[in-house]
Amino acid sequence: MKFKIQYSICSLLLLTLLTSCYNQERNCTDFKTGKFTSETEIEGKKYTSTFERNDSIQIETYEGKIDTFKVRWTNDCEYIIQNTNPKNREEKKPVQMKILTTDSDSYTFEYSFVGDSKKQRGTVTKLK
């Protein structure tokens, strides 16, 4: 019995040590500016848009409609966007974006309305 407890504790410590050493590097600053395409899936339907972003403004085209958003970076990998010309109450809500992982030309992100616990995910690819 004593051996099993010691073995379990040692295994748990080893597992904790190994997982804490793995920290995937995110190069979020590479994606603060540029031209991008975004893909997200909501309830089985795929949505694609293109956008151009500088440090504080994002201009997005979705299904031929152009929207402009203010961008406020809260840290290197998180930012909040808010529509500058909302047409309804839903478009007035700011959206919190968090970059989860990065590759050389793309990143995976998570987003939600500020204060909402329901999160969605998507992928952004930087265009050349």
Identify the function of each model-found stretch.
Residues 60, 100, 108-121:
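Short, exposed beta-strand-loop hairpins at the edges of beta-sheets
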Residues 46-74:
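N-terminal glycine/threonine-rich, aromatic-flanked beta-hairpin/loop signature
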Residues 70-78, 99-106, 126-128:
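A short, structured loop/turn motif at beta-sheet edges
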Residues 28-44:
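Tryptophan-anchored aromatic micro-motifs
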Residues 17-20:
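C-terminal motif of bacterial Sec signal peptides marking the signal peptidase cleavage site
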Residues 22-24:
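Bacterial signal peptide processing site
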Residues 80-104:
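An anionic, turn-rich surface loop/hairpin at beta-sheet edges
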Residues 1-10:
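Bacterial N-terminal signal peptides that target proteins for export
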